[in-house]
A protein has these predicted regions:
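Divalent metal-cofactor coordination and adjacent catalytic microenvironments
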Residues: 1-128
Length: 128
């Protein structure tokens, strides 16, 4: 997917496009490639549509943006001089919240859940 396709989708569909507009074309292109690469790893069974790639590309750009969207990024506290940021759930999710809402858990998360469920299985038997 190219940068212009994502740009057109943002122009037509998103009000909060500040992180995209602030980034230059080179960073926008890298964000799109990075989003596609990560999404292909996390959601191998899904076709990567423009909306999903766009949400993740914006999430990537917001992550390097010094003016983070604190609430959306689940930030709990910020310290300026020590340059520390703490998150409510321990760390910033690597998957954009909008992507997670659309596609659900990643393939790795599903595999972990299945492994945990397999460990909890109890097999019945008969005493003689």
């Amino acid at each position: 997917m190219d940068r212009q396709t994502v740009n057109d989708w943002i122009v037509d569909n998103m009000l909060d496009s500040e992180a995209w507009l602030r980034a230059g074309e080179q960073k926008q292109s890298v964000a799109v490639k990075q989003a596609e690469r990560k999404l292909a790893l996390w959601y191998p069974e899904y076709e990567l549509v423009v909306a999903v790639v766009t949400y993740q590309a914006l999430w990537e750009l917001q992550g390097v943006d010094p003016a983070l969207k604190y609430q959306k990024h689940n930030v709990k506290t910020v310290t300026d001089n020590g340059e520390s940021v703490s998150y409510k759930d321990g760390e910033r999710d690597v998957v954009a919240p909008d992507v997670r809402a659309l596609l659900g858990p990643t393939a790795d998360e599903l595999a972990e859940q299945e492994a945990e469920e397999a460990l909890r299985l109890q097999y019945g038997g008969a005493l003689i």
